[in-house]
């Protein structure tokens, strides 16, 4: 299992939200480049980057910062948030982003998703952001009528090789991941699963490793000092 430290961006700053609520924003750092370099120095194998402005606005608001960051560190970066056309997918990947995360578009435009997979294969991941069993889009602000298990199975059938699963109600809470949700997905699909939302401490990391998923995304636990990124990386390598 790999550990993906998270950097969520609003107005060019690294922030954390509570349960996806934009009104409950906490700035954790003004310089995202320093954070990324620190993650690199601690041995991060991947960095998870989210353009929260983009997720809300529907286009890649912080694109310049994201592309500059890709040139700043020698660690693969995955990016999500507001990526809703092929041109943006193409630009990000052609300029050094290792993996692009599609959420809203995966729900609303299967044709575009298929085209992205045909062109870029495993560089395309789908974000499944859910609450009460249903998938949300548009920056976690719009509930769909899609059950997360049905959606995951459909994504697998379309050729998606990896999914990032977030329980919105857990995000930023330090309450621990939704293991029940992850186990149901693990039994249902045969694709890479990355867990996001609620990771509290090193014990959670050990538990996630034991269920044998691809990755774990953690932000608040690192920024709050609850979790040592280096220790998490060391025990999962």
Curated annotation (Swiss-Prot):
Pfam families reported for this sequence: His_biosynth
Disulphides: none
Segments passing through the bilayer: none
Any single biological process term in GO: L-tryptophan biosynthetic process
Coiled-coil ranges per UniProt: none
GO CC field: cytoplasm
InterPro entries for the chain: Aldolase_TIM, His_biosynth, HisA_bact_arch, Isoase_HisA-like, Isoase_HisA-like_bact, RibuloseP-bd_barrel
Protein's cellular compartments: Cytoplasm
GO terms, molecular function: 1-(5-phosphoribosyl)-5-[(5-phosphoribosylamino)methylideneamino]imidazole-4-carboxamide isomerase activity
Family: Belongs to the HisA/HisF family.
Protein name: 1-(5-phosphoribosyl)-5-[(5-phosphoribosylamino)methylideneamino] imidazole-4-carboxamide isomerase
């Amino acid at each position: 299992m790999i550990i993906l430290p998270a950097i969520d961006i609003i107005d060019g700053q690294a922030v954390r939200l509570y349960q996806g609520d934009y009104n409950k924003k906490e700035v954790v750092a003004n310089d995202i480049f320093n954070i990324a370099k620190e993650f690199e120095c601690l041995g991060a194998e991947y960095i998870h980057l989210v353009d929260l402005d983009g997720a809300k606005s529907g286009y890649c608001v912080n694109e310049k910062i994201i592309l500059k960051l890709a040139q700043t560190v020698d660690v693969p970066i995955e990016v999500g948030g507001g990526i809703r056309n092929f041109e943006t997918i193409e630009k990000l990947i052609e300029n050094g982003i290792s993996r692009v995360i599609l959420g809203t578009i995966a729900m609303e435009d299967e044709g575009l998703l298929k085209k992205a997979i045909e062109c870029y294969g495993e560089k395309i991941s789908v974000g499944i952001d859910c609450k009460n069993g249903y998938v949300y889009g548009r920056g976690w602000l719009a509930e769909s009528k899609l059950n997360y298990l049905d959606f995951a199975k459909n994504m697998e059938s379309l050729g998606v090789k990896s999914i990032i699963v977030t329980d919105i109600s857990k995000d930023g809470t330090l309450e621990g991941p939704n293991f029940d949700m992850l186990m149901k997905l693990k039994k249902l699909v045969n694709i890479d699963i990355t867990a996001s939302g609620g990771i509290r401490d090193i014990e959670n990391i050990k538990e996630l490793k034991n269920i044998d998923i691809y990755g774990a995304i953690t932000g608040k636990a690192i920024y709050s000092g609850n979790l040592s990124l280096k220790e998490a990386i060391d025990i999962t390598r």
